[in-house]
Regions:
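Metal-cofactor-binding active-site regions of metalloenzymes
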Residues: 2-289, 341-343, 347-359, 363-466
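Metal/cofactor-centered catalytic core regions of large enzymes
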Residues: 270, 316-320
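C-terminal amphipathic alpha-helical interaction region
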Residues: 293-295
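Hard-cation-handling environments
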Residues: 299, 304
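Short glycine/proline- and charge-enriched loop/turn segments
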Residues: 308-316
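Divalent-cation-assisted or electrostatically stabilized phosphate/pyrophosphate-binding catalytic cores
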Residues: 323-329
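Short, basic/hydrophobic alpha-helical segments
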Residues: 332-338
Length: 466
């Protein structure tokens, strides 16, 4: 029997061990998509206790605590941090096979030097150890980033954001890690939302544009894109129900938008036509600016109305949406490609059954502009577990070029989540090592070592051009 999460954790062959320890492990991290609050980096936040780091905004953990029958007061309510940690520890011991079990223990090992198992009985010991460690200077937000060997972080930012915290970080020469904004303009697209007109007023203020037409909406966004670009932004991100394509004329789009500006509701057909026009218009802008476009789709959000009413979005009540016609995604990409205005694009579906569809679609739109211009994104959200990563990389290898894959991202709100890169690299090295062990690829250490280093870091550096 193997030891619990030792140095060869998840590395089943000699080649896998060699590739990870001698090549992948030492590579830096380029975290091109996360939800970390830049204010916490600017102010170099120190955390009072492990609950603040682990449970403050982690809806992955909240879901499992609810699944364990934990009262909401111990999850997002007014229970003490020690009580919340106890409930999490009692939940974690039941999470065999869940990535949260592995992530949590990798974090305990790497940042706190704890190699035991966290459960209800050890909670007090771990609580005291972690909290003592968190008082050290080396455990501040910036130092956690430094010790994780991170070179660059892309946060997730709305077009109306001031980016003041990014400015403060950039002006501080004592912090060598680049922290750049990433453009997330979902609120300007979601005209079906009840607060849409309120949002447009905010966009008018920051852009200086009177938004009285679809054309003026795009102009306001273009001005904000220029502002983001001045702050180093070259990455966009969209959260979509699915990648739709319902084309309409300019006149039809203007009529739909005018109806919404009057405070009237729009039909589902109108909504899809508007969103299509919006995504095509922004895709063209990204191509002009040489930005990378990320499309996250296949989500049905905020399903539990009672919890949503109390906590709002990002509360752990989202699920997979299995309606995502690949034909419409292909048509959307083609609408940009046919006029040579398709930017570098990364496609992420929450539904693992979309892996093969994505793999075939990206092969239709590659070009000499970049190696792997159109990427299948790393296994995302409910898929960033051992099996999900294996399935995503295997599908990509079956249908494309795994050697050009840009690899992992944290997609997290926590400064301890960089161990997800280690988790990914171990799984990736084990997958490749297994193919070599099985005689499916030559045991050429030089070629293989370069490949795993590229997937771990170098491909992302080349692709994004930071």
């Amino acid at each position: 029997m193997k030891a619990f999460m030792d140095k060869d954790f998840l590395l089943e062959t000699e080649m896998a061990q060699k590739l990870y320890h001698e090549y992948a492990a030492k590579m830096p991290i380029l975290d091109y998509h996360c939800h970390i609050n830049p204010q916490e980096i600017a102010e170099d936040r120190k955390f009072e206790n492990i609950t603040q780091v682990w449970l403050g905004g982690d809806h992955y953990k909240w879901r499992q605590m609810r699944s364990n029958g934990v009262e909401e007061k111990y999850i997002t309510g007014d229970a003490s941090d020690r009580e919340k940690f106890q409930k999490w520890a009692e939940t974690l011991e039941k999470a065999i096979g869940n990535p949260l079990y592995h992530w949590s223990h990798l974090e305990l090992q790497r940042y706190f030097g704890y190699y035991g198992a966290l459960n209800g009985e050890t909670a007090e010991e771990v609580w005291n150890l972690c909290n003592a460690k968190l008082q050290e200077d080396g455990m501040s937000a910036r130092n956690l980033i430094r010790q994780s060997n991170v070179t660059l972080v892309c946060t997730t930012d709305d077009p109306v954001d001031s980016l003041e915290w990014h400015e403060k970080i950039a002006a501080d020469e004592s912090f060598e890690v680049r922290v750049l904004p990433a453009w997330r303009p979902d609120k300007a697209m979601n005209l079906e939302k009840t607060d849409y007109l309120e949002y447009l007023k905010k966009l008018e203020v920051v852009s200086g544009v009177k938004i009285d037409s679809f054309a003026s909406l795009i102009e306001a966004l273009r001005i904000r894109m220029d502002y983001f670009a001045e702050h180093g932004c070259s990455v966009s991100d969209h959260g979509l129900e699915y990648v739709m394509y319902a084309p309409a004329s300019e006149e039809e789009i203007e009529a739909i938008f005018a109806k919404r500006l009057r405070g009237e509701a729009v039909s589902r057909a109108d909504e899809l036509q508007f969103k299509t026009a919006y995504m095509v218009a922004l895709g063209r802008e990204y191509h002009k600016k040489n930005w990378v476009m990320q499309l996250h789709y296949g989500v049905k959000r905020d399903n539990n109305g009672m919890i949503f009413g109390k906590l709002g979005p990002d509360a752990g009540i989202d699920c997979i949406n299995n309606y995502a016609p690949s034909s419409e995604m292909a048509d959307y990409l083609n609408a940009l490609a046919i006029t040579d205005e398709l930017p570098k694009t990364i496609l992420y579906s929450l539904n693992p059954t979309d892996n093969a569809a994505i793999g075939t679609i990206i092969g239709c739109f590659q070009s000499e502009e970049a190696r792997g211009k159109i990427q299948q994104g790393s296994a995302w959200w409910f898929n960033d577990n051992k099996q999900g990563m294996i399935e995503q990389m295997t599908s990509l290898a079956n249908l494309g070029l795994l050697g050009n894959f840009i690899g992992m991202l944290t997609d997290s709100r926590s400064f301890l989540s960089y161990t997800r890169h280690e988790y990914f690299r171990r799984i990736m090295c084990n997958l490749i090592g297994g193919w070599v062990e099985n005689g499916e690829y030559p045991a050429d250490e030089k070629v293989l070592g370069r490949m795993v280093q590229d997937i771990s870091y170098n491909n992302a550096v080349r692709y994004f051009g930071f």
